[in-house]
């Protein structure tokens, strides 16, 4: 293989990524290359041994992915990003994904491993009708509406309970002097 772009340069000084770019440019847009074929072409051009290529392969693949001038086209095919307009790149990728989808996948039926066809077995995943008996419905609960007469009877019952504890005769009358309270606030 001969690449005119590298005429007069020492092959040992060339990187695999530079050679890959030159190979793809020479082949042209309609000739995307499988990764393995690209690596074989690079090995042939540079004249490197299999051991040298195997050692450099992880770094080359990383460079191929991180270098912005290459684009994966699916099925491990590679091309140059400059071959495609930005909108066209999305379309290429989408059409490749659509082709891979093929027939729609059938959903698997869920099977309970503990239900081995025994009709008498209890299926605990179903809602039990007994559970509904324990719930209270809010429509059955009646709330007391406020009635002023009820409040009076509550106050009277409270007072009568207090009188049982402390009879009224034992309660001392305390005078509240509001003027004293105002003076205390002014002093502070």
Swiss-Prot record:
It holds the Pfam family HARE-HTH. GO terms for cellular component: DNA-directed RNA polymerase complex. It comes from the Bacteria. InterPro entries: Asxl_HARE-HTH, RNAP_delta_N_dom_sf, RpoE. Residues 117-188 are annotated as: Disordered. GO terms for molecular function: DNA-directed RNA polymerase activity. GO terms for biological process: DNA-templated transcription; regulation of DNA-templated transcription. Residues 14-83 form the HTH HARE-type domain. NCBIfam families: RNAP_delt_lowGC. Participates in both the initiation and recycling phases of transcription. In the presence of the delta subunit, RNAP displays an increased specificity of transcription, a decreased affinity for nucleic acids, and an increased efficiency of RNA synthesis because of enhanced recycling. RNAP is composed of a core of 2 alpha, a beta and a beta' subunits. The core is associated with a delta subunit and one of several sigma factors. This is Probable DNA-directed RNA polymerase subunit delta. It comes from Streptococcus uberis (strain ATCC BAA-854 / 0140J).
């Amino acid at each position: 293989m001969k690449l005119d772009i590298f005429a007069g340069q020492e092959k040992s000084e060339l990187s695999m990524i530079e050679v890959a770019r030159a190979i793809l440019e020479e082949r042209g847009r309609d000739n995307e290359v499988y990764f393995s074929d690209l690596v074989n072409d690079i090995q042939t051009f540079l004249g490197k041994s299999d051991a040298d290529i195997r050692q450099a392969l992880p770094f080359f693949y990383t460079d191929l992915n991180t270098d912005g001038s290459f684009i994966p086209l699916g099925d491990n095919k590679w091309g140059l990003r400059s071959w495609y307009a930005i909108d066209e790149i999305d379309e290429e990728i989408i059409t490749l994904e659509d082709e891979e989808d093929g027939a729609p996948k059938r959903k698997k039926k869920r099977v309970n491993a503990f239900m081995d066809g025994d009709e008498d077995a209890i299926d605990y995943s179903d809602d039990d009708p007994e559970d509904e008996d324990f719930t209270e419905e809010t429509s059955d609960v009646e709330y007391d509406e406020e009635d002023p007469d009820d409040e009076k009877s509550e106050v009277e019952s409270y007072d009568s309970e207090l009188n049982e504890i402390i009879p009224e005769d034992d309660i001392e009358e305390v005078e509240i002097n509001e003027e004293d309270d105002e003076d205390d606030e002014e002093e502070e």
